[in-house]
């Protein structure tokens, strides 16, 4: 970052902060090496968002890095096409040699998928994504792809139950960017709602599949990923040895 500023540390080019920086890479490698000496096998996870050439080098050195797919998955869950291709959530699509990409659909910085499903979801005849039951089914749909793409994942709190309060939800029920960091309702009662519980179990089944002895190698080692995420009809096949999964 300092390399984009003038000699006084001012007039910085914020847009240049993500450009590949070899000095930054060296610093991170030093941190990683020290951690592995002190705690062998420890995970190092970066909220980095640098140029892909830098992230490739860090990923191949053992780091895991966040990958923001909020817009892509939300476009898919709402049933709209402009940004619904989530191919960049596949580590091989970025040229990475290891599945160290931690993709996420939601985070502390991103809008809740269910909020936008219910507010802006597509409608076709009787099929209405703005209705709770259908919106939750759309979350099962995107979850099927999200959890079966190899690599670690991040799930934001209550996403597994279809939490629909906006990131900008205010205590009085209104929506404002001024309320972004305000406390949000804690809805443990969602587990007793059948459609929300169905989503919970659908996501749990996908996660359990990742730990199944028959399929675990698909998510933890070099594998062949063929897919087409560009159109309305999406599919993916992951193969490792004799094991394979197909998601449609």
What kind of feature is each model-predicted range?
Residues 113-132:
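Short, basic, glycine/proline-bearing loop/turn elements
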Residues 246-248:
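Asparagine-centered strand-capping/turn motif at beta-strand->loop junctions
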Residues 2-110, 126-127, 135-136, 144-153, ...:
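Active-site-proximal helices and loops of the catalytic beta/alpha 8
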């Amino acid at each position: 970052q300092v390399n984009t500023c003038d000699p006084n540390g001012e007039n910085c080019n914020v847009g240049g902060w993500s450009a590949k920086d070899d000095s930054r890479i060296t610093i991170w490698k030093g941190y990683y090496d020290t951690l592995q000496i002190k705690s062998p096998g420890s995970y190092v996870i970066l909220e980095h968002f640098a140029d892909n050439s830098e992230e490739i080098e860090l990923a191949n050195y053992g780091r895991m890095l966040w990958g923001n797919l909020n817009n892509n998955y939300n476009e898919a869950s709402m049933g709209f096409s402009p940004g619904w291709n989530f191919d960049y959530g596949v580590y091989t699509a970025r040229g990475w040699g290891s599945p160290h990409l931690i993709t996420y659909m939601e985070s502390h910085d991103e809008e809740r998928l269910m909020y936008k499903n219910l507010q802006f979801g597509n409608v076709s005849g009787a099929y209405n994504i703005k209705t709770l039951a259908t919106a939750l089914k759309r979350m099962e749909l995107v979850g099927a792809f999200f959890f079966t793409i190899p690599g670690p994942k991040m799930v934001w709190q209550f996403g597994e139950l279809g939490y629909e309060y906006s990131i900008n939800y205010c205590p009085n029920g209104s929506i404002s960017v001024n309320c972004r960091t305000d406390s949000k309702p804690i809805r443990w009662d969602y587990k007793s709602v059948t459609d929300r519980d169905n989503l919970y179990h659908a996501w749990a089944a996908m996660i359990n599949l990742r730990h199944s002895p028959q399929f675990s190698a698909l998510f933890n080692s070099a594998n062949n990923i063929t897919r087409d995420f560009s159109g309305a009809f999406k599919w993916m096949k992951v193969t490792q040895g004799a094991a394979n999964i197909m998601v449609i």
